[in-house]
């Protein structure tokens, strides 16, 4: 499966490395073209996830169309503040029909919406919207240490298909249709942890 990851921070890079190591073709895109060029040249995200080599099946693009070409799934791994703009860009680039999974946690500041609700508002006809959440850390996933996370969506057949496609010996995904509960749990857990 070809996965496009929007966002080149620590978590986006860790997910990209993980899926690339487990037989997926992965393309990353972020707004900062200079950062992506450095990642391509150094084969590493020295700014946000130093010490982890980018696999050969992972490419970093400053051109969103190139990153989306042939994509079967888009994972938006930005801050919640950057989520709406990223999804708007997907729509503008003709990719609003692609399945979208958010891997960021929180509520949109201006609207109070959860991440999947922001995606639904921007892409109202998209029926394949999900949330990835759970107790996981970028460095641990990049080291290929085991983790378990939830992949939630209101679309049960699709989410079950995605769990089958994305499960690996390292990352165990559990399907859940309580997307509100999963998104709220992810959003408030950091507050409770503090």
Where are these regions (language model features)?
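NAD(P)+-binding Rossmann beta1-loop-alpha1 motif at the extreme N-terminus of oxidoreductases
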Residues: 1-52, 60-62
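Rossmann-like NAD(P)(H) cofactor-binding subdomain of soluble oxidoreductases
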Residues: 61-69, 73-146, 162
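Short, conserved active-site loop motifs that form the nucleotide-linked donor/cofactor pocket
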Residues: 57-59, 171
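Short, charged/polar "capping" segments at the starts of alpha-helices
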Residues: 34-38, 109-110, 159
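Internal alpha-helical scaffold of NAD(P)-dependent oxidoreductase catalytic cores
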Residues: 82, 93, 118, 122-126, ...
């Amino acid at each position: 499966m070809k996965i496009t990851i929007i966002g080149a921070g620590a978590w986006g890079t860790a997910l990209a490395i993980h899926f690339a190591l487990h037989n997926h073709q992965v393309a990353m895109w972020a707004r900062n073209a200079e950062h992506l060029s450095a990642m391509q040249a150094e084969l590493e995200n020295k700014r946000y996830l130093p010490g982890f080599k980018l696999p050969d099946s992972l490419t970093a693009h400053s051109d969103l169309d190139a990153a989306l070409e042939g994509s079967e799934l888009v994972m938006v791994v930005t801050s919640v503040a950057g989520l709406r703009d990223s999804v708007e860009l997907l729509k503008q680039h003709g990719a609003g029909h692609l399945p979208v999974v958010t891997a960021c946690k929180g509520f949109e500041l201006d609207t109070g919406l959860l991440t999947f609700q922001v995606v639904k508002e921007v892409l109202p006809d998209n029926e394949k919207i999900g949330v990835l959440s759970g107790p996981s850390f970028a460095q641990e996933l990049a080291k290929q240490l085991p983790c378990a996370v939830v992949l939630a969506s209101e679309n049960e057949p699709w989410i079950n298909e995605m769990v089958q496609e994305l499960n690996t010996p390292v990352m165990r995904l559990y399907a859940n249709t309580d997307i509100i509960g999963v998104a709220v749990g992810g959003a408030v857990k950091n507050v409770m942890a503090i």
